[in-house]
Design a protein with these regions (language model features):
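Acidic, serine/threonine- and proline-rich intrinsically disordered appendage/tail regions
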Residues: 2-7, 19-25, 109-139
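Short beta-strand and strand-turn-strand segments in soluble, beta-rich domains
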Residues: 10, 49-62
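Short, solvent-exposed beta-strand/turn "edge" segments of beta-rich domains on protein surfaces
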Residues: 15-25, 65-67, 82-86
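Structural beta-strand segments of beta-rich domains
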Residues: 25-31
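Asparagine-centered strand-capping/turn motif at beta-strand->loop junctions
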Residues: 31-40
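Intrinsically disordered, low-complexity Pro/Gly/Ser/Thr-rich segments with frequent PxxP/GP/PP motifs
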Residues: 56-84
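Terminal connector regions
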Residues: 81-126
């Protein structure tokens, strides 16, 4: 059994590939997410709310079920129409997940660098998590 302090879901997140989509500044980005815990993790949704690296919420139906120590890939359509060389700090992927029957939010902070070709490249800098309802405010 894991200690109480490690009850939070733990993941890694990596950008795998990026392809241009129809329309200026639209990209199809493939991500790899890995469950670092010894229990399953269900991914229900992800969104990217930053204005310079943005997508609508993507609901996973059915949920992406990651067994212990397993990884999976998913795609998100992102709008990023920034000039070459621009670095966007504090962009986020915000996941809605369930672990051991409890809802959590996982915040993956990424740094996005726009290459000379205009292609956005995201590097994960920090991943934090927050249990839904911890503050007494319902979801």
């Amino acid at each position: 059994m894991e200690p109480v302090q490690s009850a939070a879901p733990q993941i890694t997140l990596t950008q795998v590939s990026v392809e241009p989509e129809e329309g200026t500044g639209n990209w199809k980005i493939l991500w790899r997410v890995a469950n670092l815990n010894s229990q399953p993790l269900d991914l229900h949704a992800v969104r990217l709310p930053h204005g310079q690296f943005k997508s609508a919420e993507r609901r996973f139906e059915p949920a992406i079920v990651l067994a212990a120590k397993q990884d999976a890939q998913f795609q998100v359509f992102v709008h990023c129409d920034e000039p070459a060389g621009l670095v966007t700090e504090n962009a986020f992927l915000i996941f809605q997940v369930v672990r051991l029957g409890e809802p959590w939010r996982i915040f993956a902070r990424v740094r996005v660098t726009v290459k000379m070709s205009g292609t956005p490249v995201a590097t994960t800098e920090l991943i934090t998590m927050q249990q839904v309802g911890f503050s007494g405010v319902p979801d």
